[in-house]
């Protein structure tokens, strides 16, 4: 039986702070209205991800620091923000981004394996985490067709039946796409 994992990027914040901006809270509520029920709900340990989860309307059941830890060598590679095909090329290089992507996919697999057949889990994480994890989860997919960088509250919906099988790119309503603020 299929299981579903939805992985979303956090909402926009009021920089330089970590707290979501009012527009970010509104955007998270739009996601809530289209998402349905999730169990479990997992977040990175970064406050903006936790607060996005709450703004979407869910209690954070589990916090995984690795969903928010970007290794220095991955950050220094300067890959993000970037389209899925650019991230795919970085993942294919078998360097730090490849290892990072594989780690995200392993975390996601561990989460989806915990849910019952027919269940859905939500992960709230960060830019590049979404793109890299999705690419590593479905390495044979046509990543170029997946589009540009994931914006705030956007993400992927992956189906799982022993392995990840299908990836649907999740967008916010037209006119609300924003990668950086």
Q: Could you say what each language-model-derived stretch is?
A:
Residues 2, 69-79, 117, 135-181:
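Acidic, low-complexity terminal tails and accessory targeting/binding regions
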Residues 13, 129-130:
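Short active-site segment of divalent metal-dependent hydrolases/proteases
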Residues 46, 50, 105, 127:
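Conserved glycosyltransferase catalytic-site signature
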């Amino acid at each position: 039986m299929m299981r579903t994992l939805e992985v979303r990027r956090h909402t926009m914040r009021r920089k330089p702070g970590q707290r979501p901006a009012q527009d970010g809270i509104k955007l998270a509520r739009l996601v809530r209205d289209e998402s349905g029920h999730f169990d479990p709900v997992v977040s990175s340990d970064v406050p903006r991800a936790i607060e996005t989860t709450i703004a979407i309307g869910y209690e954070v059941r589990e916090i995984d620091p690795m969903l928010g830890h970007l290794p220095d060598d991955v950050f220094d590679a300067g890959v993000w923000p970037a389209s899925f095909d650019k991230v795919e090329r970085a993942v294919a290089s078998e360097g730090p981004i490849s290892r990072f992507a594989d780690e995200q996919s392993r975390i996601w697999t561990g989460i989806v394996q915990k849910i019952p057949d027919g269940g859905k889990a939500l992960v709230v994480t960060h830019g590049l985490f979404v793109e890299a994890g999705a690419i590593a989860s479905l390495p044979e997919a046509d990543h170029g067709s997946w589009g540009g960088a994931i914006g705030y509250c956007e993400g992927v919906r992956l189906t799982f039946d022993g392995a990840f099988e299908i990836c649907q790119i999740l967008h916010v309503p037209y006119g609300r796409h924003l990668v950086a603020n």
